[in-house]
Structures are given as C-alpha cells and as structure tokens.
Amino acid sequence: MSTLFVSDVHLSEKNPKLTDLFFYFLKNKAILSRSLYILGDLFETWVGDDNITYISKELANITNYLADNGTSCYFIKGNRDFLIGKSYFKSSKITLLPYKKIININKQSIIILHGDTLCLNDKNYQKFKKLVNQDWLQKFFLKLPLCARIKISNLIINKRKKLNLKRMNYLTKINKEYIKKIMEQTNTNIMIHGHIHMPKVHVLPNRKYRIVLGMWNKSGSILEINKKLSLIKFSKLYCSYTSYPLKY
C-alpha cells in the first residue's frame, strides 16, 4: 500500500468544485492508501472549531470513514489553518503532528513540514508568523464573537491576495542552505513540503530529494510513495504521473 501527501488544498465555501474534487480524492484514492499526510493549508481559513460548516462536517465524516477502514490521516498546520483545535482533530480522527516531523517509509528517512518556515527571505512574514503563534493572542482571538473573527479573517485574506500578487517571486525563494542544514541535522534524505505552490521533485546530491507539493485548483496535486516517488496531477477524469525511483 502507498502513502499519500497533499497540501494547499484551500477548501472554501466559495469553491464548491474544488471541495467536490478533494472529497472525491479522499473517497476514491486515499481510501486505498496506508496513510494520508496533509501538510497544511487544507482550509482557506479557520477561525475556530465552533465555526461549523458543510465542509468541516463532511470532511470529518470522510476522515472518520478512512480511519475506520485502515487509512490513517495526519496533519501539519499551515499558515491559514493554524487555529484548528483539539476538538476538531478528535472529531475527525485526524492526528495532529508538530510543525516538523520525521517519518520513515520503505527505509527512507523523511522530514515533512508545511514549508513557510523555509521562506527566510520574507522577513515580514516570519515576524507575522511569530506574532500569531503566540498562545495569548490566539486565545484572545478565539474569544471574540464568531462574526468578528470571520470579518477579520476576510480582511486578512483580501490583503494577503494583494500582497502575494506583488511579492510572489520574492516569497518563493526558498533558502537552499537552510534546507541543507535541516536535512543534515535531522539525518534525513527526503524533504516534503508545500506552501510555495510550485510542484516539483528536486534531485539533490548524495541521493537526496526535496519534493514540493502543488496547490489544488482545477486539478489536485498529490505525492505518492511506494517503491518510487510519484507526483500526481489528479482529476476525476485522469491522473498523470511523474515518477522517480527510490535509491537505497
């Protein structure tokens, strides 16, 4: 059985076709796998576990079904859904992982993360991330009325879209020396991350790989690991594979 990885799905009530595609993937592809790792930004935004929507309810129903039928689901928080709380993970039978996690698959030592922490060139974002991850600020925000949290979230989303149009090239400049340092310190030979929306398998020296997951839109972006690495462009009608052999 294979292990699957996705990130940057950005589920939103405003994009029902995307939601339908992701749920189709869970029911028809993920159900056949051993494990599914979701590496952040599953949701376009998350303002609290009390904001119950069709998407959050149906996703929990599906992941419960997966867990009950042998597919384990794991989650690393991204920069859009870092406020998902314990109650939702419990109700959905999804296991929360730390921001960086080392796993082993087929004798491969792999480090997984969302990927925003690799964008060291974006100093303003790193300051923002440090601020919003403070426990006191998150508790304060979650105590606000739900309508206020939704309004604040929408303002942030609109501002983020404008900033990203101007700064996308700058934001996607991953610090390669930092990546090398992380992989050496953790003694891993594969790194998997999302965030920058540029799917690719980067072949590194010494039989190492850095795999970037893509963003979901009209099609899905999936990494599958079994006896090889495969980046999959997924839709209901077709799947295209770009595969690389695993080196032992």
From Swiss-Prot:
Record GO terms (molecular function): manganese ion binding; UDP-2,3-diacylglucosamine hydrolase activity
Cofactor needs: Mn(2+)
Binding residue positions for Mn(2+) 2: D41, N79, H114, H195
Gene3D superfamilies, alphabetized: 3.60.21.10
Positions of disulphide bridges: none
Binding annotation for Mn(2+) 1: D8, H10, D41, H197
Broad EC category: hydrolase
Matches recorded under InterPro entries: Calcineurin-like_PHP_ApaH, LpxH-like, Metallo-depent_PP-like, UDP-diacylglucosamine_Hdrlase
GO terms under biological process: lipid A biosynthetic process
Assigned keywords, A-Z: Cell inner membrane, Cell membrane, Hydrolase, Lipid A biosynthesis, Lipid biosynthesis, Lipid metabolism, Manganese, Membrane, Metal-binding
Topology versus the membrane: Peripheral membrane protein
The name this protein goes by in its record: UDP-2,3-diacylglucosamine hydrolase
Species: Wigglesworthia glossinidia brevipalpis
Lineage, top ranks: Bacteria, Pseudomonadati, Pseudomonadota, Gammaproteobacteria, Enterobacterales
Encoding gene per record: lpxH
